[in-house]
């Protein structure tokens, strides 16, 4: 090999890299899974509570025991995708702060499947987040990291971490990570679809079309949520489209640092970036601190954030490393 040709950088997760290899095939081979359906008549729809690209979500009632539940009616998508979501939910059953799948039913005529979940009395994040204290932010961030560490330890990337998918019952101080429709099994060295996560929460790896990503994608999304919480912003990086999203990130993390990342993994940037990227120095996190957020954006919070929001996915803290950070010491 000639000197100028560097060997391609192999990117493998620093943790839980081989979980699925060590599991029996049926653990991750969702395509060959046989679902068992319950009875649709056991559930009644009360009211609509949300809708997504792939589903409509209702508050429901289990008529057998008169308990509330959530009914997620799936829109027609590839059945393989539905199987993946079910398999992942079953694999994660009972994990800390993971939403519980109670039943799977389907309409006898239309064959439309619905997933029945535990009920969480959620307060919309736009209402809740501005009211959270410093302690609350530490507490709920830690609870979310528990859920993420658990799914990662089971060989699963969530790939859609954002406030809309974190249900919080503030009265009970209960957090649940929901919507596992984009979640996927991690196999080291495998190339994945970069069309995952919501724009404002997409990691740089997705925006530069790097397909060999891993669990650290979820850490980026978590970091973006955390930044918005401590700096009291609605959204921390708010791009107009996927290209502009990377520009918004570069204006904070710097362009030299972006080029170093791209070079390390031998990524070829889309030519569209030539005209829009410009040149930006890395911004100091303290430049986002103001009178309004000073009590939340303290030294420990900023040190943690700095270790989460890194271009290089291999440099980001893992969930366990983040949970061991001094920021969370007060909870222990």
Curated annotation (Swiss-Prot):
Give a GO molecular function annotation for the protein: protein serine kinase activity
InterPro entries named among the record's database cross-references: CK2_alpha, Kinase-like_dom_sf, Prot_kinase_dom, Protein_kinase_ATP_BS, Ser/Thr_kinase_AS
Q: Which Pfam families match?
A: Pkinase
List the catalytic activities from the record.
L-seryl-[protein] + ATP = O-phospho-L-seryl-[protein] + ADP + H(+); L-threonyl-[protein] + ATP = O-phospho-L-threonyl-[protein] + ADP + H(+)
Q: Which residues bind ATP?
A: 49-57, 72
Q: Where is the signal peptide?
A: none
Print the keywords alphabetically: ATP-binding, Kinase, Nucleotide-binding, Serine/threonine-protein kinase, Transferase
Which Enzyme Commission numbers does its entry carry? Answer: 2.7.11.1
Q: Where is the active site?
A: 160 (proton acceptor)
Q: What does this protein do?
A: Catalytic subunit of a constitutively active serine/threonine-protein kinase complex that phosphorylates a large number of substrates containing acidic residues C-terminal to the phosphorylated serine or threonine.
The protein's name: Casein kinase II subunit alpha
Q: Which organism is it from?
A: Schizosaccharomyces pombe (strain 972 / ATCC 24843)
GN (gene name): cka1
